[in-house]
């Protein structure tokens, strides 16, 4: 079963076509990585999936429902969760309080249910030891973990990760990869935009390559990275 599917989705900003008839589907439980040069349309693609942008053409389906014109908050309630490139937690709140806000926002849940979910997510993201630490005092790695945890606290069926490994040392990156691999092994469906290629290939089953808003390749990571067109466009290597 495809959890999310895009069919010929295009988005223009004035005369600029940012995504051009993009089509792909992600089955439930799969992890898809998205790569491409800066300005290729990757973040716009995320905004089309979350409902922050409406496409000028094409269709977005989630959980078998046409959500093309549904607002972002509806999609959050349906199970679309997202992290952002630059973590922006509530600096004056503790790690636990940041999660509790995300877990309870607009959902009418009991305090006991929120607490249970937050503790589980803190354990899954290795933040339980920092539950009572103010978010403003966290290291970059732990801010990234908190960004991931806040996305998980919304109860997603689909987790969108936007360059979450950026700026980390190799050791920090490996620690974050281990966390994401664990979430994926538990059944989480993931779409992950990333420039740190080895982070992606450690987790995802497929890679999609965007260039000037067009899909130029999608498939197993080894096959994609062996592609002449991908090597020339993305890696700048003549093959």
Spans of features found by a protein language model:
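Glycine-rich phosphate-binding loops of nucleotide-dependent enzymes
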Residues: 2-239
